[in-house]
A protein has these predicted regions:
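Catalytic-site microenvironment of enzymes
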Residues: 2-313
Length: 313
């Protein structure tokens, strides 16, 4: 009986060992088959491209160079011929001093000399602009004081300012003034200025008062300007006018826009948007007092208008 039980136990143990071995072999074969038929895919990390510039032109930092033009200057009667020539004035076929209102269409360097331009001129005006037409007495000094104040405020805001004149002993032509929109006044190069601000004061018989801007109106056809040149020029002029009205004692003249002088040489030749400001009426006693006492405030208004424009365009 004992022997029989012992045999049974041995058989059970042997059976268990056989079952274990068979199971191990089957599992090993299955594992080997799965391993040999499978692949492991590794997705590599993207390699960064060093130095690639994905920014488009509009996203790049725009110029912070502002050209400020204090209108008028030294009376032409006090200028020698050499001085006129060095200041950008030219002589026409009659030997008279002045400058041409336009460039040849599409140019930024070739004066029209009466043809090859869009021909836009003021009422009773012409392509030729005599030097004496720009002579002023009181206004020149008012303009440069307001312009210098604007320069100080703009520089404090981080802008680079180029002045078209720095004293009342200078009277560059408009063409020469606009050359400051270019690096080193080199008009064969691309303009590097952002904006051109022309600062003037008005006169109208002593009754009118206030600040306004002269608006541009298409068509203009000089080189470098964009399709929205007039629109941008008018937005710039409007912003400066509103800021001066807001912080100074000057009020707005009319609705703040003077619409009847879009043929100004500045508009016809500037390569960049141009704000053309008429700040107060110097022949009105109340405005004249403000113009003599609030230059710093007026300059701040101009600077704030420029800064607002640059931050929104």
């Amino acid at each position: 009986m004992t022997k029989k039980i012992t045999k049974i136990i041995i058989l059970v143990i042997l059976s268990a060992v056989i079952i274990f071995e068979v199971g191990y072999i089957i599992n090993r074969n299955i594992l080997n088959d799965n391993t040999s038929n499978s692949t492991i895919e590794i997705t590599p990390e993207p390699i960064p491209v060093v130095g690639r510039d994905d920014e488009n032109d509009d996203a790049k930092e725009k110029s912070k160079i502002i050209v400020i033009d204090p209108g008028h200057g030294k009376p032409s009667s006090l200028m020698s011929d050499e001085e006129k020539q060095s200041s950008g004035w030219v002589q026409n076929s009659d030997g008279d001093w002045g400058e041409w209102r336009h460039y040849k269409s599409g140019s930024a360097t070739e004066n029209c000399e009466g043809s090859g331009c869009n021909g836009r001129v003021p009422t009773n005006g012409a392509c030729w602009y005599p030097i004496a037409n720009g002579d002023r007495s009181k206004e020149s000094d008012i303009n440069i004081r307001n312009a210098m104040a604007a320069k100080r405020h703009l520089e404090a805001m981080g802008y680079t300012v180029r002045m078209t004149r720095n004293s009342n002993n200078e009277n560059p032509s408009i063409t020469k003034r606009l050359s400051y929109c270019y690096p080193n006044n080199d008009m064969t190069k691309s303009p590097d200025a952002r904006l051109f601000i022309s600062i003037h004061s008005n006169a109208s018989g002593g009754e009118s008062r206030g600040v306004a801007y002269i608006s541009a109106k298409d068509p203009y056809d000089q080189a470098w300007i964009t399709a929205d040149y007039s629109k941008l020029s008018n937005e710039l002029g409007s912003l400066c006018t509103k800021q001066i009205d807001e912080i100074s004692s000057l009020s707005i003249y009319g609705n703040g826009e003077i619409t009847w002088e879009p043929e100004l040489i500045t508009f016809c030749k500037s390569p960049v948007p141009c704000g053309y400001l008429e700040i107060g009426f110097f022949d009105n006693s109340s405005d004249f007092a403000i113009l003599n006492s609030e230059n710093e405030i007026i300059g701040e208004g101009v600077a704030k208008g420029v800064d607002e424009f640059c931050k929104t365009h």
